Amino acid sequence: MSMKRKKIVIGIVVFVVLATVSLLIANTIAKNKLKDYIVNLPEHITIVYDDLDVSLLQGNITLKAPLLTVKGKTTNQVNAQVKLANLDIKGFGYWSYLFNDKLKFEALNFETPLVTYYHNPLADTDQGSQSVLKNIKKALYIKNLNVNEASVKVINVENDSIIFSTNNLNFLMTQISINDDLDIKTLFKFKSSTVSANNLKYQV
């Protein structure tokens, strides 16, 4: 092998090694930033999960077996819980997040979520919804939000009765955005939505 060819081979090897190391470092930085964001949610909102997978090249993130719990700010009682098989995020805009502090996703997929909401007639549910979304504290854009095969149960806390339930619920919402331009009464904007479900039960 000639000296010129050796230099070319060495240069290629060095480039591949540097690119791989840089990718691993960037991947670790992005993963740690996401972990910090989850840890630093408001006290009444918690997310626990089994594992967090990040693929920088594909822009994909998977939270394995996450459990979201939302409590009342004053009562400290559980208002809602969402348990999923997986939360899959596709096409995450890392550079928008790292440098512009903006959350941007091509798709957000909730796989087989089990949703339990504890309805309190005396509570201000609209205020609670605003609290969760406003606490995101970042500009947010989601091209497609998919909920696949969800089970939903709404429980009346006054008598522990089930006032609403359904299973195999599928939901799609497109072009969702949250930013500082929205007025206080508007939680978010979206373009379209579709929903289907089985075994819908409602207590009048």
Regions found by a protein language model. Give the residues of each.
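N-terminal type II signal-anchor transmembrane helix
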Residues: 2-43
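Sec-dependent signal peptide cleavage junction
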Residues: 30-40, 124-125, 129-136
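Flexible beta-edge/linker motif
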Residues: 47-122, 131-158, 174-203
